[in-house]
Amino acid sequence: MAYNHRMSQQFRGSQQHHGRGRKKEDENDALMRLPDKEIAGCINDIGIPFTAADLIKPNPQQIQMVFEWFAELLMNITHEAVEPAMRAAADDVGGDFPDIVPTDTRNLMGFFVSLRKLMMECGVNDFTFTDLTKPTHDRLVKIFSYLINFVRFRESQTPVIDEHFNKSEKTKARIDTLYAENQEMEQRLEEMRRNLRANEAQVKEKVRRNDELKARLLELRRNQERVAETLERVKADKTRRQTQLEEKTEKVVRTRQEVEKLRPYAMESPVSLQASLTELSENLLREKAQIDAMEKRARALQTSSDTFTVVSNDVQACVKLLEDISVELQKEEDEESRASRNKEAISERGNSVREVEQTEKLLQRQLARWNERIETLRKNAQEKAEAAQARMEELREVQKQLREERAEKQRDMERRRIRIEQTEKKMVDLKENIESEIQSAHDEYLRLESHIKLYITEMEKCI
């Protein structure tokens, strides 16, 4: 009786220890768990009729509908969304036998894969396919609690998320706008550079032509000056020659007049006439020679005059060409002024481009600062997530330790139970041995008693 009482105490102690371990394990999810009525009310708020009785005795189709609503709300995924991919996968796997797996089961399996990702994000790491097909009250309370808390957390952080999202969208839109403006400015700058290069080539060509025309103009001016000097010199020589010719002609006329006057006197003396004739012949020859020379000189002067006329015409053509060149030079000056204005406009555009580049750099720096702030917020969120993960890991370690302690205690209990069973067996054997020894001792006692009685009887007979 005492032994059985001790065994019952040990059994009650193991049950209490097992209950404490289970209680510590459940305390890990105590902060996340919600009452049944609150869960049913939240599901009713989303438009799905649901009661606490439905949670206690769950219907798989109803539970799948609730899960589908949460998946559509948080991930925009439904049965219809996964159907094309699952049908294509079934065609690839099944080949000529696509109906091996029913369509509903196939879509439910694909929906389960997407839903498991959502559960992992919500903190439910042990979500299984059985939770969809054969849900239980305890599992549904845990899963719905995590889901509802996740949705509440998301709704509570919606302004912050929207604010950062709107800021990032505005920054992105501003970047796109600045990038488009930058591209437009670069195109305009490239077009201006092309125009500048084309204008520079034209300006260089015009400058080269201008230099050539200036050199030719200077040469023509020098030639004109030389021709003008030659013309003046020839005109002066012509005037002088004409004067000399007139003088010679006048002398010849006077000489002839004198000859006519002296002719009567020459008839008086043959010798004197002969002498006079000889003298006159000589004078005549000299005069003829001079006249021939004068005629030659006149012809030369006429030739020079014709040459001067041709040269004068050439000079007039050169003057006209110079006028054309001056007009071209004026046009060149206009082109140069226009090119200078274009250069000024290009420099102004370059200044505008530099201002745009400075604005772009400023916006890039602002973008970098916003990115740094976003990165800081992301790091803070990551640090918080890491802290939560670390806390979760600590809780998991504690849970693991508790499980190990529980397993160790269970093993210890098992060893003690085995020892107790062995001790009980030994005690039973010992009891049996004692009882057999008592029985044998009793038999021996009876035998000795019978022997003693027999001996006493024989002693009495002998007496």
From Swiss-Prot:
InterPro entries listed in its UniProt record: Kinetochore_Nuf2_N, Nuf2_DHR10-like, Nuf2_N_sf
Keyword Coiled coil: yes
Annotated compartments: Nucleus; Chromosome, Centromere, Kinetochore
Spans annotated as Disordered: 1-29, 330-357
GO MF entries: microtubule binding; protein-containing complex binding
Top-level taxon: Eukaryota
Keywords: Cell cycle, Cell division, Centromere, Chromosome, Coiled coil, Kinetochore, Mitosis, Nucleus
One Pfam family in the UniProt entry: Nuf2
Function: Acts as a component of the essential kinetochore-associated NDC80 complex, which is required for chromosome segregation and spindle checkpoint activity.
Subunit structure: Component of the NDC80 complex, which consists of ndc80, nuf2, spc24 and spc25.
PANTHER family: KINETOCHORE PROTEIN NUF2, MEMBRALIN/KINETOCHORE PROTEIN NUF2
Name of the protein described by the UniProt record: Probable kinetochore protein nuf2
Native source species: Aspergillus oryzae (strain ATCC 42149 / RIB 40) (Yellow koji mold)
